[in-house]
Amino acid sequence: MTQIFRIALLGLALALPLLASGVEPEADRWNLKDLYPSQPGWDKDAGTLEQELKDLSGCAGRLAQSPARFKRCLDLNAEVLKRFYRLYGYASQSRDEDTSLPSGQNLKQRADVLGTRLEEATSFLRPEILGLGRSKVNALLKANKSAAIYAHWLDDILRSASHTLDRRGEELIASFGAATSAAEAVYSTLADAEMPWPKVRLSDGTEVVVDQTAYEKYRALGNRSDRKIVFDAFWSKWREFERTFGVTLYEQLKKDAALAKIRRYPDSLAQALDANRLPQAVYDTLLTQAELHLPTLHRYFKLRARMLGLSEMRYYDIYPPMVSSNLKYPIGLSTELMLASVKPLGEDYVRAMAQGTKSGWMDVYPRPRKRSGAYMNGSAYDVHPYLLLNHNDDYESLTTLAHEWGHAMHSYLSIRSQPFINAEYPTFTAEIASTTNELLLLDHMLKIAQDDSERMIYLDSALENLRGTFFRQAMFAAFERDIHARVDKGESLTGEALTKIYGDILKRYHGDTQGVVKIDEIYTIEWAFIPHFYNRFYVFQYATSITAGAMFASEILNEKPLARERYLNILRAGGSRYPYELVKAAGVDLATAAPYQAIVARMNSIMDQIEVIQAKGK
């Protein structure tokens, strides 16, 4: 699968589970007819793609015959990619509407096959462009000014010369793409479909099957004994499959190490970062700063323990809210609040978002067999973004709405500003758009809060967001760096070994030996629960994104000159520039300590506000 397509669908593949129950009216469903009126339309377009792939093969060995032919071949490649993204979006979203229907599964499988054929058909492009060399490519661009839209795309290929194989080698890698995805497929099948989930009885007599959805719901119960029962049952079941999940993750790590070696990178991390020309200083600085500021995370845990009335904080005390809330946020109200919160981004932004919310872009409510989680798919260039939600009328659902619409507006602005080949953006900037909108929402909610009790709800949520998005993702990134480095060096890893490595990091981040949060050994299997580890070095970008988003949101809200325009220019730029340089040019250098120090200062400031409110009540 092409790099640009991986980027387009990462959010889809990595959606985190939310609650799934209830039924929604038809008006709250997305309109896939904007993609294709019916499956026959999809079938026809799939046939067109097959023919275009054959036509594209005619470009092999002939790219440089003339400037005009060079441009035509690049245009055909772009058209092939654009058509495939639309086909794949319809197939995957049809499957997600009801994951039990064979028709949806079949369509998704057909789209996967098309993806493999596309990989094979386009595999000649990179080695042939590299064979031309930079001077020849520049001459072709100069001779045909209309080809300038491909300048960045071509530069991204040319800079990878030392890491690209010859045509036959690239064809082999493309052909083996599907075969080497078995680790993730096995993991997903077991974790999502075949795990024999345990059943527990809660203190009120309720019997619960503790699957992933139930775990995420019941881990936040107010009754501490119930939380422990849920935790123990859930993680004990994962522990039973420690060896199996150890095999699947180790196979994934071996695949990543092999690809890095084949492409002549020193290690897996170097290859992952080079995909978007990210300096390793970004990764290293994030982890250094996260570890340096663990006392702030520990301060949060101590505050949480005090507010929950606990003499000892345990891992199953992480999730219950510090402040209870009965406030409801149905989708209509949530949409109004979201639209009000983004007013600092300007009238055009608000108007476009408002139109999208009532134009069939969203599938809003949970229902049986609908895919859990939330994602935005903005890969259908000629249509519009789509959002899958599982809205439960709570504050978390409101923040998820703001998050996913941040992604959607990023796609909307990018598509309006860039040609197709430059419209898709990397994860490094994608999550900035979503987290910035979350932070704007928080600011708005704090401003309209009726009293300190309501304000505490939002401050509590903000703290948990910082824990989960900055510190927790940095912790995952530390684990990834460790296990990849071991396999890159030729070490073998078992499930037991992975549990030990993860457990040590988990305990360090939570201050286990310092008595901050006690981590029971049974919970150190948590690594097996995280699907992100099958997409190498992805999660660190959540932490860098909330860091950058906090700075952008602060500057925009404080009406710093040009702050809004610099931020919107990141969204409009799409994938037309390398992301680190793009964000740096807007004023945030994520390879330096300052942005991370600012996000930690923000977390401390929120805790200060909570303690001031607490002091009032004494």
Label for each model-derived stretch:
Residues V23-E24, K33-P37, G41, L125, ...:
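C-terminal, non-catalytic "cap/extension" segments appended to globular domains
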Residues I7-P17:
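Bacterial N-terminal signal peptides
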Residues S21-S324, T335, L506, I613-K616:
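A well-structured
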Residues L327-Y329, D382-L401:
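Short pre-active-site segment immediately N-terminal to the catalytic Zn-binding motif
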Residues R264, N392-Y412, S434, L439, ...:
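Active-site recognition of the HExxH zinc-binding catalytic motif
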Residues S411-T435:
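Post-HEXXH active-site segment of zinc metalloproteases
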Residues L310-S341, H410, L463-T469, A474, ...:
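Long, K/E/R/D-enriched contiguous segments that form extended
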Residues L327-Y329, M362-H384:
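Catalytic zinc-binding patch centered on the HExxH motif and its immediate surroundings
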